[in-house]
């Protein structure tokens, strides 16, 4: 049987919010079975809980943000959400003392390090998966994203199309058979990226105030400005894949199926997930409880070495 997972104990980290520029202290705490991922704003009195689910995503401007009916938010959750998906974490309390998750280095890797540092505990309940039964497609102009049935795991195929000298001749398509190992080694270190020409406008809108060469890949009109260059030759499309993994984990369960997308982003990823969940005949919840049952997605174990 493949079981639900949480952490063995609590762990804390401090960083800066990518868009707010504010210092953030974040604490991960183990949660009971069937809790899901729950974000808590501990700077508010009383503390406000925001469960991670697709319907709570009410802002997708340059990030994924959970926002409740009162307007309380936790923003920029996508990189952490991707790390939780990659590590197969089902149940967790995420406490933050600010409206945003810290950006760390702009990738999911520091979150994975924190999760591995304290260790993962299996719980006495079967892990649930969302298995795709029917194809679903959403579009926005020339952009599109879709799910298809696929019983052998979670297969992802994502393509971007940026018209910029740095992207010319560079692979802008990424295909992934999702697993804990493939995520950690091939995707998790890909950083968020942005263009110098956009930064002044973004900051005038109180966005990207915490962005820097320490937590993002920055491009001018011709080149990458980071002295150390790229972590992967195709880091840009891999970061978009990372974002999609995080956005699609807003159902609190790993997906068994195929995801294909062209020029997708946070809004379209969320639109696709909502469209799927709204069509009950298009998916089913499955578990692998038999003694010999093997789930089609393999997750981190203590033998996995960080990339």
UniProtKB/Swiss-Prot annotation:
CC cofactor: Zn(2+)
Tell me the GO BP annotations in alphabetical order. Answer: lipid A biosynthetic process
Instruction: Give one GO term, molecular function aspect.
Output: UDP-3-O-acyl-N-acetylglucosamine deacetylase activity
Which InterPro entries would you find in this protein's record?
A: Ribosomal_Su5_D2-typ_SF (IPR020568), UDP-acyl_GlcNac_deAcase (IPR004463), UDP-acyl_GlcNac_deAcase_C (IPR011334), UDP-acyl_N-AcGlcN_deAcase_N (IPR015870)
Which pathway does this polypeptide act in? Glycolipid biosynthesis; lipid IV(A) biosynthesis; lipid IV(A) from (3R)-3-hydroxytetradecanoyl-[acyl-carrier-protein] and UDP-N-acetyl-alpha-D-glucosamine: step 2/6
Keyword match Metal-binding: yes
The EC designation for this entry is 3.5.1.108
Which residues are named in the active-site annotation?
266
Q: What is this protein called?
A: UDP-3-O-acyl-N-acetylglucosamine deacetylase
Q: Which organism is it from?
A: Aeromonas hydrophila subsp. hydrophila (strain ATCC 7966 / DSM 30187 / BCRC 13018 / CCUG 14551 / JCM 1027 / KCTC 2358 / NCIMB 9240 / NCTC 8049)
